[in-house]
Amino acid sequence: MGQKVNPISNRLGIIRGWDSNWYGGNDYGDSLLEDSKIRKYLNARLAKASVSRIVIERTLKLVTITVCTARPGIIIGKGGQEVDKLKEELKKVTDKDIQINIFEVKRPELDAVIVANNIARQVEGKIAYRRAIKMAIANTMRMGAEGIKIQISGRLNGAEMARSEMYKEGRTPLHTFRADIDYCHAEALTKVGLLGIKVWICRGEVFGKKELAPNFTQSKESGRGNNGGNNGGKNFKRKKNNR
C-alpha cells in the first residue's frame, strides 16, 4: 500500500501537518474553494520564485498565508513592495484581511517540489532528461539526503510509444511512517506531449513527538519583509532537513 499512496497524505497526523489549518463549519465548502483559488493564483503568480509549500490558516476575520520559497527576495521585493502588491491582488479572491509570511527554504535540493519543477523546466528547455535527473540526484545526495527516487514517464526522446524510467540512489522506505519522505508530481510540456515527473526524497527519520502544526511566526527583528512579510525559518525544523 505504501508504494501506491501519496507519501505525504499517508503521513498526515503522524509526522506531517496539513497545509490548510482552520475550522469551517457550515462554510467549509466556500473556504475550501477559496483556498484552492489562492493556491492556484499564487503558484501561477510566483512561478519563478521556486515556491515549495503554501500554508493557509484562518480565523474569523483574518487569512494568514505562509509561502515557503527558495527565493524570498523575488516575493518580498524592495522594502516589501511586492508583498503589499500581492496582498492587494489577493483581496479580489477573499473579503477577509490577509497577512502574508515568507519562509525561506534553506536547502532547496532536499525539497521534492523544487527538485521536480527544476527537472521539468530543464526538460522543457530541451536539456536531456537523463542529464537533468542525474544532476538532481547528485545535488540532493550531496546535501545529506538518505535517498532519492525519480520516475519520468511519457514519450521520452520523442519515441512512438510512451514508457517509464526510474532512477534512484540510497533508501526511500515508503512503508516506514517515521521516515520523512517528501513527494511531488510535476509535468513538463514538450513538442511530443506531456512528460510526468515524480520525485521521492528521504530526509531521514523522525523520532519522538512531532509538532504537526509548525509555527512559522518570528520576531520582527529577524523578519525579511514588511507588513506581514516575515521569515519564520527558525521554528520550522526537521530531523535531517532545516527547511
Swiss-Prot record:
InterPro entries: KH_dom, KH_dom-like_a/b, KH_dom_type_2, KH_sf_prok-type, Ribosomal_S3_C_sf, Ribosomal_uS3_bac-typ, Ribosomal_uS3_C, Ribosomal_uS3_CS. It comes from the Bacteria. GO terms for molecular function: mRNA binding; rRNA binding; structural constituent of ribosome. Gene3D superfamilies: 3.30.300.20, Ribosomal protein S3, C-terminal domain. It holds the Pfam family Ribosomal_S3_C. Residues 214-243 are annotated as: Disordered. Residues 38-106 form the KH type-2 domain. Keywords: Ribonucleoprotein, Ribosomal protein, RNA-binding, rRNA-binding. GO terms for cellular component: cytosolic small ribosomal subunit. GO terms for biological process: translation. PANTHER family: 30S/40S RIBOSOMAL PROTEIN S3, SMALL RIBOSOMAL SUBUNIT PROTEIN US3C. Binds the lower part of the 30S subunit head. Binds mRNA in the 70S ribosome, positioning it for translation. Part of the 30S ribosomal subunit. Forms a tight complex with proteins S10 and S14. NCBIfam families: rpsC_bact. Belongs to the universal ribosomal protein uS3 family. This is Small ribosomal subunit protein uS3.
